[in-house]
């Protein structure tokens, strides 16, 4: 066991969940000043997950932007897919980009997420100053539509 080990890390990730999404604060990076806690991990044998690796196949652009009868701004990618969205923004520190994902619209043409069975399927990106690019590091969804909740 080391006696004078000092490890530090920093990240903008505030919350990360496979189904619910990611909250990322870009003003917190790259701060490598948070002490790391060393602890005894599990002793169970790890088993490799079987199946295809998830990797990017192609990039798609938004096909249409529209406003729903409820007054929500929605981006339509023209097809249902599995993926993530990469943000390109020019913003001020503290500005927030808040997006929700859906596969279908309801019969009135409004944003619909009930089929996600409780998964939030959202990105919350807190901006730093200037031009920035970001995409989540763990989360991806099945979606066709993105609702812009805040920007």
Q: What positions do the PLM features span?
A:
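Extracellular/oxidizing-compartment recognition motifs
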Residues: 1-151
